[in-house]
């Protein structure tokens, strides 16, 4: 899977969290680790890159400030 695959996993992790404020990076990491074969440093690297790309493109947003929880913004 490419970066779009990781972005879809991040979006699925946020949706699975079922809270209005989104999901923490730790919760997203746990979800991706449980639902993919990525582990350790590779998982952390790909997750950081996917979060950064999603925030930059507007596909993801921080509900409060520039750190913490991440959510998929409403269109």
Curated annotation (Swiss-Prot):
Subcellular localization: Nucleus; Chromosome
Predominant localisation class: nucleus
GO terms, biological process: cell differentiation; chromosome condensation; nucleosome assembly; spermatogenesis
Tissue expr: Sperm.
Family: Belongs to the histone H1/H5 family.
Function: Linker histones are implicated in chromatin remodeling and/or transcriptional regulation during spermiogenesis, the process of spermatid maturation into spermatozoa.
Name of the protein in question: Sperm-specific protein PL-I
